[in-house]
Amino acid sequence: MDDVTAARVKAAFRHVNRAMVMLWRLGLGRWVNIWPSGSGRILVIGHTGRRSGLRRWTPLNYASVDGELYCTAGFGATSDWYRNVTAEPRVEVWLPGERWMGVIDEVSDHPERIRLLQAVLVASGFAAPAAGIDPRRLGDEALAAATSSYRLLRIRQVAAAEPLPPHPRPGDRIWWWAAVACGGLFWHARRHQRQHHPQVWQ
């Protein structure tokens, strides 16, 4: 992938990522993961900006292999979230029905890197093919060459040293659905009244 294409793909993923995080906050985390072969298996990590110190949120494709969670930085060392977790590996993790503190370790030199990376790419659904990589068809050597810049990371759950922050969290904006429903009912009631009691609006 050339630099121009990579920049466009990164920009597209940035917009998708924002929408994905909002879906989790709207309580749709389970639905986001309902089609693993298409949209992939997705979790969200909360990480600390290496310069700003602010909390950032990034959805990631992941695979569970031998009881461990693995993800990859497809844009290598240029990924902002990767540079953030390299500087501060402690992260907050959102999974369907779960929320906990964890630590991210880079394991790019793992002896089974290709097997683990292939599992993550298969679990990414359309994302890997969109980047020009078909993990189901490529052999080990071809996959290693195509992903030479990829970083492989492992996420481990740890006991939280401090309480998880109340916001943001999965489902913290689920009340939006009630607001939308109330707005819809109000609009429907006004429309019905205009149709059946037009004199009220004259």
For every predicted segment, state its role.
Residues M1-W35:
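Extreme N-terminal tail/first-helix region
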Residues G183-P198:
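Short hydrophobic alpha-helical membrane-entry/anchor segments
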Residues G40-F75:
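Short beta-strand segments
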Residues A63-V93:
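A short mixed-secondary-structure module that forms the rim of ligand-binding clefts
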Residues M22-R51, W176-G184:
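N-terminal first-folded block
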Residues G38-R41, V85-R90, S149:
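A short, compositionally biased
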Residues I45-G46, P89-G97:
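Short conserved beta-strand and strand-loop elements enriched in small hydrophobics
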Residues D2-R14, E98-A178, H196, V200-W201:
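Charged, gly/pro-rich active-site loop segments
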